[in-house]
A protein has these predicted regions:
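Conserved short loop/turn motifs at secondary-structure junctions
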Residues: 2, 52-57, 119-121, 137-142, ...
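Short helix-adjacent coil turns
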Residues: 107-114
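Core structural elements
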Residues: 60-73, 87-99, 116-137
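Acidic, turn-prone loop/beta-hairpin segments
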Residues: 78-104, 132-208
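Conserved beta-strand -> loop -> alpha-helix junction used to position metal-binding or nucleic-acid-contacting
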Residues: 2-5, 186-187
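Catalytic adenosine-cofactor/nucleotide-binding cores of aminoacyl-tRNA synthetases and other
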Residues: 4-85, 174-179
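Generic structural signal for hydrophobic core residues of well-folded globular domains
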Residues: 30, 38-42, 68-75, 119, ...
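Extended, hydrophobic alpha-helical segments in both membrane/secreted and soluble proteins
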Residues: 1-2, 9-12, 23, 34-35, ...
Protein backbone atom coordinates (compact mmCIF):
# COMPACT_ATOMS: atom_id res chain seq x y z
CA UNK A 1 0.00 0.00 0.00
CA UNK A 2 1.11 3.57 -0.61
CA UNK A 3 0.09 6.94 0.79
CA UNK A 4 -1.42 9.86 -1.03
CA UNK A 5 0.21 10.92 -4.29
CA UNK A 6 1.08 14.62 -4.16
CA UNK A 7 2.32 17.06 -6.79
CA UNK A 8 5.95 18.21 -6.89
CA UNK A 9 5.10 20.98 -4.39
CA UNK A 10 3.75 18.29 -2.05
CA UNK A 11 0.18 19.51 -2.43
CA UNK A 12 -2.79 17.20 -2.87
CA UNK A 13 -3.51 16.66 -6.56
CA UNK A 14 -6.78 18.21 -7.64
CA UNK A 15 -8.45 18.83 -10.99
CA UNK A 16 -9.70 22.19 -9.76
CA UNK A 17 -6.15 23.26 -8.93
CA UNK A 18 -4.91 22.06 -12.29
CA UNK A 19 -2.09 20.04 -10.75
CA UNK A 20 -3.43 16.53 -11.32
CA UNK A 21 -2.19 13.86 -13.70
CA UNK A 22 -4.16 10.66 -14.15
CA UNK A 23 -2.48 7.24 -14.27
CA UNK A 24 -3.97 6.75 -17.74
CA UNK A 25 -2.21 9.88 -19.00
CA UNK A 26 1.13 8.77 -17.56
CA UNK A 27 0.72 5.27 -18.98
CA UNK A 28 -0.07 6.68 -22.42
CA UNK A 29 3.15 8.70 -22.38
CA UNK A 30 5.50 6.25 -20.69
CA UNK A 31 3.93 2.78 -20.50
CA UNK A 32 2.45 0.69 -17.71
CA UNK A 33 5.69 -0.82 -16.47
CA UNK A 34 7.39 2.56 -16.19
CA UNK A 35 4.62 3.82 -13.93
CA UNK A 36 4.59 0.63 -11.87
CA UNK A 37 8.37 0.82 -11.45
CA UNK A 38 8.35 4.47 -10.38
CA UNK A 39 5.49 3.97 -7.90
CA UNK A 40 7.28 0.96 -6.41
CA UNK A 41 10.44 3.02 -6.12
CA UNK A 42 8.80 6.05 -4.51
CA UNK A 43 6.11 4.52 -2.35
CA UNK A 44 7.09 3.67 1.23
CA UNK A 45 3.59 3.53 2.67
CA UNK A 46 3.65 7.30 3.10
CA UNK A 47 2.46 10.30 1.09
CA UNK A 48 4.92 11.12 -1.68
CA UNK A 49 5.43 13.74 -4.37
CA UNK A 50 5.04 12.54 -7.94
CA UNK A 51 7.32 14.24 -10.46
CA UNK A 52 6.83 12.94 -13.98
CA UNK A 53 10.36 14.07 -14.83
CA UNK A 54 11.57 11.10 -12.77
CA UNK A 55 10.32 8.89 -15.57
CA UNK A 56 13.57 9.73 -17.35
CA UNK A 57 15.43 7.91 -14.57
CA UNK A 58 13.22 4.87 -15.11
CA UNK A 59 13.92 5.02 -18.83
CA UNK A 60 17.66 4.99 -18.16
CA UNK A 61 17.33 1.88 -16.01
CA UNK A 62 15.26 0.14 -18.69
CA UNK A 63 17.81 1.16 -21.31
CA UNK A 64 20.59 -0.33 -19.19
CA UNK A 65 18.63 -3.59 -18.93
CA UNK A 66 18.26 -3.54 -22.71
CA UNK A 67 21.96 -2.82 -23.29
CA UNK A 68 23.04 -5.61 -20.95
CA UNK A 69 20.63 -7.96 -22.72
CA UNK A 70 22.15 -7.02 -26.10
CA UNK A 71 25.66 -7.57 -24.73
CA UNK A 72 24.80 -11.00 -23.31
CA UNK A 73 22.85 -12.17 -26.37
CA UNK A 74 25.87 -11.81 -28.64
CA UNK A 75 27.91 -14.16 -26.46
CA UNK A 76 28.27 -17.87 -27.38
CA UNK A 77 25.72 -20.31 -26.01
CA UNK A 78 27.45 -23.67 -26.39
CA UNK A 79 29.03 -23.81 -22.92
CA UNK A 80 26.44 -24.13 -20.16
CA UNK A 81 28.96 -24.23 -17.31
CA UNK A 82 32.14 -22.30 -16.61
CA UNK A 83 35.37 -24.25 -16.28
CA UNK A 84 37.14 -21.85 -13.91
CA UNK A 85 36.39 -18.70 -11.94
CA UNK A 86 38.55 -15.59 -11.60
CA UNK A 87 38.39 -13.35 -8.52
CA UNK A 88 35.93 -10.98 -10.19
CA UNK A 89 33.67 -13.94 -11.07
CA UNK A 90 33.61 -15.13 -7.47
CA UNK A 91 32.92 -11.56 -6.38
CA UNK A 92 29.88 -11.07 -8.63
CA UNK A 93 28.57 -14.52 -7.66
CA UNK A 94 28.82 -13.53 -4.00
CA UNK A 95 27.10 -10.20 -4.63
CA UNK A 96 24.40 -11.92 -6.68
CA UNK A 97 23.58 -14.43 -3.95
CA UNK A 98 23.53 -11.62 -1.41
CA UNK A 99 21.09 -9.82 -3.69
CA UNK A 100 18.86 -12.90 -3.96
CA UNK A 101 18.64 -13.13 -0.17
CA UNK A 102 17.89 -9.44 0.33
CA UNK A 103 15.38 -9.15 -2.52
CA UNK A 104 13.54 -12.25 -1.29
CA UNK A 105 13.31 -10.81 2.22
CA UNK A 106 12.11 -7.47 0.86
CA UNK A 107 9.42 -9.06 -1.30
CA UNK A 108 8.23 -11.24 1.58
CA UNK A 109 7.77 -8.08 3.65
CA UNK A 110 6.19 -6.10 0.77
CA UNK A 111 9.06 -3.60 0.83
CA UNK A 112 8.94 -2.81 -2.89
CA UNK A 113 10.99 0.37 -2.61
CA UNK A 114 13.80 -1.72 -1.12
CA UNK A 115 13.50 -4.24 -3.96
CA UNK A 116 14.01 -1.45 -6.49
CA UNK A 117 16.94 0.07 -4.59
CA UNK A 118 18.67 -3.31 -4.28
CA UNK A 119 18.05 -4.08 -7.95
CA UNK A 120 19.43 -0.74 -9.14
CA UNK A 121 22.51 -0.92 -6.92
CA UNK A 122 23.39 -4.33 -8.33
CA UNK A 123 22.48 -3.57 -11.94
CA UNK A 124 24.20 -0.20 -12.21
CA UNK A 125 27.22 -0.45 -9.95
CA UNK A 126 28.01 -4.13 -9.41
CA UNK A 127 27.12 -5.58 -12.81
CA UNK A 128 27.33 -2.81 -15.41
CA UNK A 129 29.98 -0.43 -14.10
CA UNK A 130 32.20 -2.98 -12.38
CA UNK A 131 31.90 -6.63 -13.40
CA UNK A 132 31.22 -6.16 -17.11
CA UNK A 133 34.14 -3.73 -17.32
CA UNK A 134 36.40 -6.34 -15.70
CA UNK A 135 35.42 -9.16 -18.05
CA UNK A 136 35.06 -7.48 -21.45
CA UNK A 137 38.23 -9.14 -22.76
CA UNK A 138 37.05 -12.57 -21.61
CA UNK A 139 33.30 -12.16 -21.90
CA UNK A 140 32.89 -15.38 -23.90
CA UNK A 141 34.29 -17.36 -20.97
CA UNK A 142 31.77 -15.97 -18.49
CA UNK A 143 28.70 -16.14 -20.75
CA UNK A 144 27.02 -18.89 -18.65
CA UNK A 145 27.39 -16.81 -15.49
CA UNK A 146 26.08 -13.64 -17.13
CA UNK A 147 23.06 -15.50 -18.48
CA UNK A 148 22.30 -17.01 -15.08
CA UNK A 149 22.41 -13.56 -13.49
CA UNK A 150 20.27 -12.08 -16.25
CA UNK A 151 17.56 -14.69 -15.69
CA UNK A 152 17.61 -13.95 -11.98
CA UNK A 153 17.29 -10.21 -12.51
CA UNK A 154 14.29 -10.73 -14.78
CA UNK A 155 12.67 -12.83 -12.05
CA UNK A 156 13.25 -10.01 -9.57
CA UNK A 157 11.66 -7.47 -11.91
CA UNK A 158 8.70 -9.59 -13.00
CA UNK A 159 6.31 -8.79 -10.12
CA UNK A 160 6.85 -5.05 -10.63
CA UNK A 161 7.38 -4.80 -14.40
CA UNK A 162 5.61 -7.87 -15.81
CA UNK A 163 5.54 -6.78 -19.45
CA UNK A 164 9.16 -5.70 -19.88
CA UNK A 165 10.41 -8.73 -17.96
CA UNK A 166 8.37 -11.00 -20.19
CA UNK A 167 9.70 -9.31 -23.33
CA UNK A 168 13.29 -10.07 -22.38
CA UNK A 169 12.38 -13.58 -21.19
CA UNK A 170 10.84 -14.36 -24.56
CA UNK A 171 14.12 -13.36 -26.20
CA UNK A 172 15.89 -15.89 -23.99
CA UNK A 173 13.24 -18.46 -24.92
CA UNK A 174 13.79 -17.74 -28.61
CA UNK A 175 17.54 -18.24 -28.16
CA UNK A 176 16.98 -21.56 -26.38
CA UNK A 177 18.40 -20.28 -23.09
CA UNK A 178 15.34 -21.04 -20.92
CA UNK A 179 12.80 -23.85 -20.78
CA UNK A 180 9.94 -22.07 -19.02
CA UNK A 181 7.42 -20.53 -21.41
CA UNK A 182 7.14 -17.38 -19.30
CA UNK A 183 9.16 -15.55 -16.66
CA UNK A 184 6.01 -15.71 -14.53
CA UNK A 185 6.22 -19.52 -14.58
CA UNK A 186 9.93 -19.62 -13.76
CA UNK A 187 11.42 -20.56 -10.40
CA UNK A 188 12.52 -17.64 -8.25
CA UNK A 189 16.29 -17.83 -7.57
CA UNK A 190 17.41 -19.16 -4.19
CA UNK A 191 20.39 -17.78 -2.30
CA UNK A 192 23.21 -20.24 -1.58
CA UNK A 193 25.26 -19.27 1.46
CA UNK A 194 28.14 -21.42 0.19
CA UNK A 195 28.54 -19.02 -2.73
CA UNK A 196 28.92 -15.99 -0.49
CA UNK A 197 32.40 -14.59 0.19
CA UNK A 198 32.16 -11.53 2.41
CA UNK A 199 35.94 -11.13 2.64
CA UNK A 200 36.17 -10.96 -1.14
CA UNK A 201 33.33 -8.45 -1.23
CA UNK A 202 35.16 -6.23 1.26
CA UNK A 203 38.45 -6.49 -0.61
CA UNK A 204 36.74 -5.41 -3.84
CA UNK A 205 35.37 -2.33 -2.11
CA UNK A 206 38.92 -1.01 -1.80
CA UNK A 207 39.58 -1.66 -5.51
CA UNK A 208 36.43 -0.14 -6.99
Amino acid sequence: MHGMVLDISKRKMSKSDGNSTTPAEVIERHGRDSLRYLLAKLSKGEDFAFDEKEMSDVSRIFMMVNNIDAFIRQLPTQDKKMKSFAAEDRWIISKYHKLIKEVTQAYNSYRFTEVINLFEQFLVFDLSRTYIQFIRERSNEVAPLLKEIQMGLLSFLAPITPFISEKFWQRLKLDGEVDESSVHLSTFPESNIKKRNENLEKSFETVI
